[in-house]
């Protein structure tokens, strides 16, 4: 059905593997009374790198970088590794370092569910405290319909801080849940409906 074709094309686009997706119905019926579908796909570059730098009078120089590998194992998996160095050259405090990685696996359990794994760590050198931390997370993202999507995840944080009061160790467990209802007529230039 046309609706089924649209849903299949949307799933392929959401994977991030393809920059262009077109699904069309064939003109002729086969001997088994079946109508074929032709898929025209243009694959994104498998590897992507980005780099950024910013300068602020109060926060010094910041440098960010990101590397992404699309379709890592051939099933639409995306691996993203990003890092940041900030507060370079500030008068107070020190340099902060952040490094993280995220693996996304689409079509887990069913065609509309994406499984995610993430790990991040950092060193924060603030005026009032120093902190070393590591954060590990895993979760599921689900598209329920063309207007409704949601996610559920679990994350574990371990951090050590040092301040004038001494050294403190933190351990935290978080269970973030999100639900998005998007009825906008356009994601880039909406003129009606809403986003909650």
Label for each model-derived stretch:
Residues 2-196:
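Gram-negative/organellar outer-membrane beta-barrel architecture
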């Amino acid at each position: 059905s046309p609706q089924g074709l649209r849903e299949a094309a949307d799933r392929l686009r959401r994977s991030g593997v393809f920059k262009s997706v077109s699904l069309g119905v064939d003109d002729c019926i086969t001997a088994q009374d079946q109508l074929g579908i032709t898929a025209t796909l243009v694959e994104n570059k498998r590897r992507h790198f980005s780099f950024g730098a910013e300068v602020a009078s109060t926060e010094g120089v910041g440098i960010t970088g990101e590397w992404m590998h699309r379709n890592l194992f051939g099933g639409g998996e995306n691996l993203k590794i990003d890092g940041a160095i900030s507060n370079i050259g500030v008068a107070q405090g020190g340099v902060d370092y952040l490094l993280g990685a995220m693996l996304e696996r689409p079509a887990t359990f069913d065609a509309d569910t994406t499984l995610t794994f993430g790990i991040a760590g950092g060193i924060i050198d603030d005026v009032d405290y120093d902190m070393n931390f590591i954060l590990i997370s895993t979760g599921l993202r689900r598209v329920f319909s063309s207007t409704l999507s949601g996610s559920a995840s679990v994350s574990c944080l371990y951090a050590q801080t040092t301040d004038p009061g001494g050294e403190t160790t933190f351990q935290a467990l978080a269970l973030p849940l999100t639900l998005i209802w998007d009825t906008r007529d356009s994601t880039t230039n909406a003129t009606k409906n809403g986003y909650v």
